[in-house]
């Protein structure tokens, strides 16, 4: 198993790196050049930089990921593609994407886009909380222990 992180706006990178390095599982952070950092990463953690274009990180993750790799993303489109490839996919708020829930998530995203396109406003996501982080940590640890 390898772990790939859609890292541009991922609030749980520290959890992923800590837990994965303790379990000696390699982590690849995929992020755009606009988030460049020369901070040193722990052994087993690699950062891949991609252009800032729409979905560039998603495309790179899909090139790299293999069946049964673990992907962390908040992007429903990437989650859908990764599920079809046989990957394990987690959201940073502590839930697992599945073939059972991805259709509903994609449909909700589409309907919200249509509402916004018509000039109306939609609610954004709820703020990320410490409880969300701990929920993610518990789920992540259970997934890498398999």
UniProtKB/Swiss-Prot annotation:
Homology family: Belongs to the UPF0178 family.
Protein name, UniProt field: UPF0178 protein BC_3040
Originating organism: Bacillus cereus (strain ATCC 14579 / DSM 31 / CCUG 7414 / JCM 2152 / NBRC 15305 / NCIMB 9373 / NCTC 2599 / NRRL B-3711)
């Amino acid at each position: 198993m390898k772990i790939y992180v859609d890292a541009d706006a991922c609030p749980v990178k520290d959890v992923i790196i800590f837990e994965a390095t303790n379990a000696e599982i390699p982590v690849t952070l995929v992020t755009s050049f606009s988030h460049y950092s020369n901070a040193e990463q722990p052994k087993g953690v690699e950062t891949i930089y991609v252009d800032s274009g729409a979905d560039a990180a998603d495309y790179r993750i899909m090139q790299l990921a293999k069946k049964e790799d673990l992907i962390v993303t908040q992007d429903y489109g990437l989650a859908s593609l990764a599920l079809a490839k046989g990957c394990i996919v987690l959201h940073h708020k502590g839930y697992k994407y599945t073939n059972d829930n991805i259709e509903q998530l994609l449909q909700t995203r589409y309907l919200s886009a249509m509402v916004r396109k018509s000039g109306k406003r939609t609610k954004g996501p709820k703020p990320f909380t410490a409880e969300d982080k701990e929920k993610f940590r518990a789920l992540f640890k259970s997934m890498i222990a398999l």
